UniProtKB/Swiss-Prot annotation:
Homology family: Belongs to the SepF family.
Paired cysteines (S-S): none
Gene Ontology cellular-component terms listed: cytoplasm
Phylogenetic classification of the source organism: Bacteria, Bacillati, Cyanobacteriota, Cyanophyceae, Oscillatoriophycideae
Gene it is expressed from: sepF
Any one GO biological process: division septum assembly
Statement: the UniProt record of this protein carries the keyword Cell cycle: yes
Protein name per Swiss-Prot or TrEMBL: Cell division protein SepF
InterPro entries xrefs: Cell_div_SepF, Cell_div_SepF/SepF-rel, SepF-like_sf
Region span, Disordered: 32-54
Main location per the UniProt record: cytoplasm
Assembly and binders: Homodimer. Interacts with FtsZ.
């Protein structure tokens, strides 16, 4: 049981032995400490909390990186949102084995026009059911465009026609406040039961 938790922590990146950078920092701190102790004692105005000093030094260390080199960055972008340009992918599969590629395209927040005219009707029905399930799982939308042609969109796409909106992008729900009651509804009944 302990090994499962350890593996999970390693996978997520919160393991306890993830301090390779910490040892380097401690060595730098030790070297600087030995240099400052060998010189004369610091004046009271030069003393500052260690936390502020470490913050300032870490900022200085990152600013010393030469241009053209990349630093390690923990920010991961949303797939498919590189330029802010929406993309529609037209896929004309020949077999059901190509359907996971359609789901992956939807997960990358790209709309898919699926033309199933080439496929066998039974296999095409199976493919539509599969992609519709994947679309539902990512809160997307599906629309039949024509005979054996379907549009699948992720949740961030608004689908509309000349006559009106077919599917609108859901807005984030606002917190609703409930009116508070001064006396509980069950108060009278509870007192009757208690007697």
């Amino acid at each position: 049981m302990n090994t499962i938790l350890t593996k999970l922590k390693d996978f997520v990146g919160i393991s306890e032995h993830d301090d390779e950078y910490e040892t380097d920092y401690e060595e730098m701190e030790y070297d600087r400490y030995s240099k400052t102790n060998s010189s004369e004692t610091l004046a009271p105005e030069e003393e500052e909390p260690i936390r502020n000093r470490r913050t300032r030094e870490s900022l200085n260390l990152t600013s010393d990186v030469p241009m053209g080199t990349t630093t390690r960055n923990n920010v991961i972008g949303m797939p498919g949102i590189t330029n802010g340009i929406a993309e529609v992918v037209v896929i004309e599969p020949h077999s059901f084995e190509e359907m996971p590629q359609v789901i992956q395209t939807l997960r990358e927040r790209k709309s898919v026009v699926l033309n199933l005219n080439v496929m066998d009707p039974e296999e095409a029905q199976r493919a539509v059911d599969f992609v519709a399930g994947g679309t539902y799982a990512i809160d997307g939308h599906q629309e039949r465009i024509g005979e054996s042609i379907f549009l699948f969109t992720p949740s961030c796409v608004k689908v509309s026609t000349l006559t009106g909106t077919v599917h609108d992008v859901p807005e984030t729900p606002k917190a609703t406040t409930r009116p508070t009651m001064s006396t509980p509804v069950w108060g009278a009944e509870a007192s009757r039961i208690a007697q």
